[in-house]
Each structure stands twice: as C-alpha cells, then as structure tokens.
UniProtKB/Swiss-Prot annotation:
Cofactor(s) for this UniProt protein: Mg(2+)
Protein name: Cyclin-dependent kinase 2
GO cellular component, one term: cyclin-dependent protein kinase holoenzyme complex
EC numbers on record: 2.7.11.22
Family matches, as PROSITE patterns: PROTEIN_KINASE_ATP, PROTEIN_KINASE_DOM, PROTEIN_KINASE_ST
Organism: Mesocricetus auratus (Golden hamster)
Location of Phosphothreonine modifications: 14, 160
Gene: CDK2
Length: 298
C-alpha cells in the first residue's frame, strides 16, 4: 500500500470507500477500492481472494481493468483503472436534454459486448446498475465491479448502511430462485436501457414486494404460460394481484420498433427465453450503431 498515495475520495461503493490514488512508482492514477468485510476479525476469506485473482484475467475494452489486488493485515484493496464518470451522474447531468439516441445505442452495444465476454467466461455480475457503469470522454463505457458479488456476496445494505438498490434486480432473484444464470445481467441492462431512453428508472421499487409489483404492473403478472415453473418458486404467492401487460409503446414511447423489440426480449420473464448478450448484439436495432462522443461536464 505504501506505493499508493491517496489523492481524494471519489465515492462509496457497495463494499467500501473508493479513492483516486497515484502509484508513486509509475505515476499512474488509479481507482483504489478498500473492501470492508464483516469478517475483518478473521481476515479475508481465501475463497474471496481466489475469486478476485481470477478477475485479473478478464481483459476486455468494456470491462474496467482490475490492475492489482493488495492484501495486507486483514484488509483488501483492489486497484482499478480510473474513468471520468459513472452513468448515473451522466444521466443526471443529461436530465433536461436527454442522452442522444446514437449514444444510448453505442453504450448499450458496448455493454452487451462486455457482458458477452464475461458470460462466455462464466462470470456473472449480479449487481449491474448505472453507478457501476463508467464512461470516459472518448465515448467508451465499461462495466465495473464484475465478479465481486460472487467473491463477497450481494449485501442488503452497504458498509454505510445504505440500502442496496433493487431497481435492476431480475424477477427470478426477487422470487427467491437460488440458482440463477447470466440472464440476471441481461434483465438489469434492459432496465438501464429503458432508463437511458425515458430519463427515469423503469421499476423504482422501495422493497422486494414493491419491486415485484412494479414489474408485474408493467409486464403483467407472470403465470405458467409465460414463465413455466414460476408458480413453484420459493417466494411466489397465488394471491399476487393479476395485472395485465402494458403495451411497450406506452412504457418507452421514444423508442422505435427495433428498440422496443430488443427491450422486450431483454425483459422476458422466463430466464431461459431471455435474449443472451451475444444474440442481442446481432439485433437489427444495432444495424446503424456508431461511437459518438459524450458531452461531459467534468
């Protein structure tokens, strides 16, 4: 750790404080994440160290690079490449004008490329949200915190007791499914896609049941026809109200037919029928994809 000089605190992640720091030997400016674990007394679990070490092998232009893992007396620091801003802050700054469609398309395409790469290596994210999608001035967007959920679990609250958001959580997780797949990340990205387009969260729930009911009110309450096996999931209740599905033209009015078609496939209830990242990249929506540069107010 003595090789790094903390410059400033840049945020608070799910697992601990994030600092902008400088490598004293190379002059490289990085993001330094201090991981706070409940097990600080016993030290860092060896399983977590193993999981994290594997992530150093995940090299892709749309994945935030894990440069180093520093494990010193019961503390764990992760050294990542540093990017300008996260998508949440960018969306907030673009709230009045909105993000131009070519940029939304470019971002979604890049994120799907990052997901396809990780999923092909059997690595899930499990906690995708605008806060862990990072952008730079060149028009790139990258997925951050990949694989951390498997190493450390997804807590209910962050280390500062903030509630971890449910807005992007897939229905199979909310219904208590223990064995989930890469499809959970596609669901999250679908929610983020809709949010970029409409400038507001698609399903901003404030509890697990509110989250589920918001999904049901938009996509219709799922049954065995649309989602075989749903009625036998641990947290499914036959008493759930039966809502009808809304037309997607009302859910995401600015989107054209191709965009709505892709979104509906990303938000398919049945995880087995939900589109994969690889298949999504071939969708007609991306026929005219380009790589525009964002107007960043830094």
């Amino acid at each position: 750790m003595e090789n790094f000089q903390k410059v400033e605190k840049i945020g608070e992640g799910t697992y601990g404080v994030v600092y902008k720091a400088k490598n004293k030997l190379t002059g490289e400016v990085v993001a330094l994440k201090k991981i706070r674990l409940d097990t600080e007394t016993e030290g860092v679990p060896s399983t977590a160290i193993r999981e994290i070490s594997l992530l150093k092998e995940l090299n892709h232009p749309n994945i935030v690079k894990l440069l180093d893992v520093i494990h010193t007396e019961n503390k764990l620091y992760l050294v990542f490449e540093l990017l300008h801003q996260d998508l949440k802050k960018f969306m907030d700054a673009s709230a009045v004008t909105g993000i131009p469609l070519p940029l939304i398309k470019s971002y979604l395409f890049q994120l799907l490329q990052g997901l396809a790469f990780c999923h092909s290596h059997r690595v899930l994210h499990r906690d995708l949200k605008p806060q862990n999608l990072l952008i730079n001035a060149e028009g790139s967007i990258k997925l951050a915190d990949f694989g951390l959920a498997r190493a450390f679990g997804v807590p209910v609250r962050t280390y500062t007791h903030e509630v971890v958001t449910l807005w992007y959580r897939a229905p199979e997780i909310l219904l208590g499914c223990k064995y989930y797949s890469t499809a959970v990340d596609i669901w999250s990205l679908g929610c983020i896609f809709a949010e970029m387009v409409t400038r507001r969260a698609l399903f901003p729930g404030d509890s697990e049941i509110d989250q589920l009911f918001r999904i049901f009110r938009t996509l219709g309450t799922p049954d065995e026809v649309v989602w075989p096996g749903v009625t036998s999931m641990p947290d499914y209740k036959p008493s759930f109200p039966k809502w009808a599905r809304q037309d997607f033209s009302k859910v995401v009015p600015p989107l054209d037919e191709d965009g709505r078609s892709l979104l509906s496939q990303m938000l398919h209830y049945d995880p087995n029928k939900r589109i994969s990242a690889k298949a999504a990249l071939a969708h007609p929506f991306f026929q005219d994809v380009t790589k525009p540069v964002p107007h960043l107010r830094l």
